[in-house]
């Protein structure tokens, strides 16, 4: 396999962690972009075929919706449907839950199970062991780029997978002492920011930071 075309010809589709979509185009336009066909496209048929895939597997997607108005999970759905539309029977997803909320993860897993039950092969690349145990039937372990082994998920635990990944037993218990200085150092109330396009990148964010602690801020990349 030397190119994405070779993968498509073999029925393999890759969904990358960072999406490759054109924001000003619709879902349907992104899905068919680059495909060979007639000089005049029958968009009515394209929408019909996409909607059949959406209904078949339980996706949340409107083929006519512009990408720039979509949530992150909907953009991911466009990428998945794009691969299905092009005939992929083997789907490889790179860190698919890294940009999703817990509810969106549940929805994604339901769709992936539907595709599995329909006979498609699903490969997920992830570091999240709890999700591996929840979704997969088998799990293959890599360490420093080398294949270590494969287990039936029913026989695996977080501890056993961690040991295979690291190469030694690892304690998963972390004891953190309470900070001595609980003096409030910073207060942020309802901060809102826009980017150069005028779209909100922060909206009504509030938090407090205290001395002697590390405050983690979690969010989607970008």
Predicted regions and their residues:
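Glycine-rich phosphate-binding loops of nucleotide-dependent enzymes
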Residues: 1-222
């Amino acid at each position: 396999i030397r190119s994405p075309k070779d993968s498509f010809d073999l029925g393999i589709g890759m969904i990358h962690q960072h999406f490759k979509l054109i924001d000003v185009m619709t879902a349907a336009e992104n899905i068919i972009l680059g495909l060979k066909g007639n000089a005049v496209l029958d968009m009515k048929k394209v929408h019909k075929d996409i909607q059949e895939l959406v209904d078949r597997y339980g996706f949340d997607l409107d083929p006519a919706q512009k990408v720039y108005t979509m949530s992150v999970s909907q953009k991911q759905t466009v990428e998945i449907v794009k691969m299905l539309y092009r005939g992929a029977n083997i789907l490889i997803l790179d860190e698919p839950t890294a940009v999703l909320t817990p509810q969106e993860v549940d929805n994604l897993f339901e769709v992936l199970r539907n595709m599995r039950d329909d006979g498609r092969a699903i490969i997920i690349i992830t570091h999240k062991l709890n999700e591996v145990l929840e979704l997969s039937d088998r799990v293959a372990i890599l360490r420093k780029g080398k294949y270590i082994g494969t287990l039936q998920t029913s026989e695996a635990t977080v501890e056993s997978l961690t040991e295979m990944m690291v190469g030694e037993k690892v304690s998963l218990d972390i004891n953190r002492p309470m900070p001595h200085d609980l003096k409030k150092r910073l207060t942020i109330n309802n901060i809102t920011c826009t980017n150069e396009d005028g779209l909100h990148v922060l909206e009504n964010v509030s938090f407090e930071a205290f001395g002697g602690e590390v405050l983690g801020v979690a969010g989607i990349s970008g």
